[in-house]
């Protein structure tokens, strides 16, 4: 690979979706554009004999909520101010059409950090230069560079085609990350310094690769006033998946999530003491689950215990969520009413 004298650097572009108004997942839009809730929007708990049954509504909002603090594990990234301190990049230089034989011959899984002097994102350790003898350069990036245990870039330096990344969701909720992926269009290398990004760097617009899951109380009947939530549990969730770092036709990312064995699934339990009050948020911030976007095929359940109910026994309130979709880059909030 014949390189020139223009160093490769990057610009992180604010491209994250901002949270929007909450919309019930089972809602329909009327001719006037307003949200219409279908009768099936709220799921009744599975205990058919419950005297005062609990109901569950699924609410989907655009984007993933951010928090104004330095970006580390468990932070949901909303803009560049929250961004991670480094990310990984692979760069493929090639001529003609992109094909599965193209390899990361320019950069392979290089750590990139912000230079405090130039305020630009530059590769750690050494400089890389734009090629002179190749027509195109294509970049693939992920953040953060330091992934949780069991997660890694699957593709090697000798593998051709679109790279894949394996992600394993940490068992500890506070260790979970807001995984970000950037897949910009190929850049014509000879035009870089003249037409594209002089003095700034190759722009990377990162997208949320996961789905945020939260819980809250929607409404409480007067006869249930004063009760408290003691535990919420999301059971038997897949925790290992492979992401192809290329956008699909709908602008999402392609995840392969095997059902697997108990080693690739987990149950997340929140032990709480929260009043059952209308509008009460149950989990948020670093208690937000960051899960794989997918349509739930298996028999997955949300379990709830209230005060006075034995935590050592089967959950009195259970909701099956098979068939629901966790959309990529969005927040799914499960709201309880009783």
Regions inferred by a protein language model and the residue ranges of each:
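Exposed, polar/acidic Ser/Thr-rich sequence context and nearby capping/turn residues
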Residues: 220-221, 294-338
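Short helix-loop boundary/capping segments
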Residues: 180-197, 201, 205-287, 296-298
């Amino acid at each position: 690979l014949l390189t020139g004298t223009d160093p490769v650097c990057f610009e992180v572009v604010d491209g994250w979706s901002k949270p929007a108004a909450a919309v019930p997942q089972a809602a329909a839009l009327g001719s006037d554009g307003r949200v219409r809730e279908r009768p099936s929007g709220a799921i009744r708990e599975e205990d058919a004999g419950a005297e005062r049954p609990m109901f569950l509504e699924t609410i989907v909002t655009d984007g993933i909520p951010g928090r104004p603090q330095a970006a580390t594990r468990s932070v949901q990234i909303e803009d560049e101010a929250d961004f991670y301190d480094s990310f990984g990049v692979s760069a493929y230089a090639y001529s003609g059409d992109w094909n599965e034989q193209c390899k990361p011959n320019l950069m392979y899984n290089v750590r990139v950090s912000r230079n405090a002097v130039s305020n630009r994102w530059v590769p750690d350790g050494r400089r890389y230069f734009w090629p002179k003898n190749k027509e195109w350069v294509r970049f693939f990036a992920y953040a953060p560079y330091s992934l949780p245990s069991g997660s890694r870039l699957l593709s090697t330096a000798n593998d051709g085609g679109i790279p894949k990344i394996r992600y394993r969701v940490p068992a500890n909720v506070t260790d979970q990350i807001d995984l970000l992926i950037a897949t910009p269009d190929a850049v014509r290398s000879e035009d870089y310094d003249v037409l594209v990004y002089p003095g700034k760097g190759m722009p990377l617009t990162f997208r949320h690769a996961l789905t945020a899951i939260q819980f809250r109380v929607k409404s409480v009947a007067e006869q249930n006033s004063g009760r408290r939530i003691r535990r919420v549990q999301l059971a038997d969730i897949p925790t290992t998946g492979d992401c192809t770092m290329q956008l699909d036709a709908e602008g999402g990312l392609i995840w392969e999530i095997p059902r697997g064995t108990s080693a690739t699934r987990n149950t997340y339990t929140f032990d709480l003491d929260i009043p059952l009050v209308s509008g009460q948020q149950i989990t948020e911030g670093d208690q937000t689950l960051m899960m794989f976007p997918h349509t739930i095929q298996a028999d997955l359940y949300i379990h709830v215990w209230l005060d006075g109910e034995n935590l050592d026994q089967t959950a009195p309130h259970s909701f099956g969520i098979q068939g629901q979709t966790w959309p990529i880059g969005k927040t799914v909030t499960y709201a309880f009413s009783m």
